[in-house]
Amino acid sequence: LIKEIKAAVTIPVMAKARIGHFVEAQILESIGVDYVDESEVLTPADEDHHINKHNFQIPFVCGLSIPRGAPPPAYRRGYAGHDTGPRVRKPSTGNVVEAVRHIRSVMGEIRLLRNMDDDEVFAYAKKISAAYDLVMQTKQLGRLPVVNFAAGGVATPADAALMMQLGCDGVFVGSGVFKSGDPAKRARAIVQAVTHYSDPDLLGRGEFGLGEAMVGIIVRMRRLRGTPIVLNEVI
């Protein structure tokens, strides 16, 4: 199937491998995929070890899908030789709130790190069982030293622009395009939104004529404590 897809398209092709299954990754590299997704949505092959990316020539991505998402798992997993880096993601639901929560938590933790002195950085790295040089590099850069993509729940051009303005380097969109009313138009509009994410006039024009957004989401209403604001939640 992967070979058929590569023969049919000119865009880069990404394929999934199970966590820790380096032989699957070797096979994917040998048949010519452009990226390997060491995917947390598949059943892991190895619960204790991730694939050593230094043994491969192609870039990898991995998921940063954790409660209150924060850098520690990114240090322990995302920097094990990832050329492309971690992505902030949740399974596709059409609800962008999970991706927003994750990237805000990650960026908030990095802001705290930037205010630490060297001794505090050393203690922090030890506390989270991460390599000191990677933690210090993050402090100096003011960001993760790998590219950071948003994925999961991005269903509109405005969603994509939101994730970019929150600090992501790019956006992965699958179901948000292919489960929409007009996939081709929506994909084109989302690409434009990522490119021109700080231009509200262009973003506004891109929201029209896209057909129905991703459907099939069951939501419930939740009132924020102490406010009149009501949120939709995925059940």
Curated annotation (Swiss-Prot):
Vitamin B6 is an essential quencher of singlet oxygen in plants, that can protect cellular membranes from lipid peroxidation. It comes from Stellaria longipes (Longstalk starwort). One of its GO terms (molecular function) is pyridoxal 5'-phosphate synthase (glutamine hydrolysing) activity. The active site is at residue 16. This is Probable pyridoxal 5'-phosphate synthase subunit PDX1. Pathway: Cofactor biosynthesis; pyridoxal 5'-phosphate biosynthesis. InterPro entries: Aldolase_TIM, PdxS/SNZ, PdxS/SNZ_N, RibuloseP-bd_barrel. Catalyzes the formation of pyridoxal 5'-phosphate from ribose 5-phosphate (RBP), glyceraldehyde 3-phosphate (G3P) and ammonia. The ammonia is provided by PDX2. Can also use ribulose 5-phosphate and dihydroxyacetone phosphate as substrates, resulting from enzyme-catalyzed isomerization of RBP and G3P, respectively. Also plays an indirect role in resistance to singlet oxygen-generating photosensitizers. One of its GO terms (biological process) is amino acid metabolic process. D-glyceraldehyde 3-phosphate binds at residue 104. PANTHER family: PYRIDOXAL 5'-PHOSPHATE SYNTHASE SUBUNIT SNZ1-RELATED. It catalyses: aldehydo-D-ribose 5-phosphate + D-glyceraldehyde 3-phosphate + L-glutamine = pyridoxal 5'-phosphate + L-glutamate + phosphate + 3 H2O + H(+). The keyword Glycoprotein does not apply. D-ribose 5-phosphate binds at residues 153, 174-175. Pfam families: SOR_SNZ (PF01680). Belongs to the PdxS/SNZ family. Keywords: Lyase, Pyridoxal phosphate, Schiff base. Its EC number is 4.3.3.6.
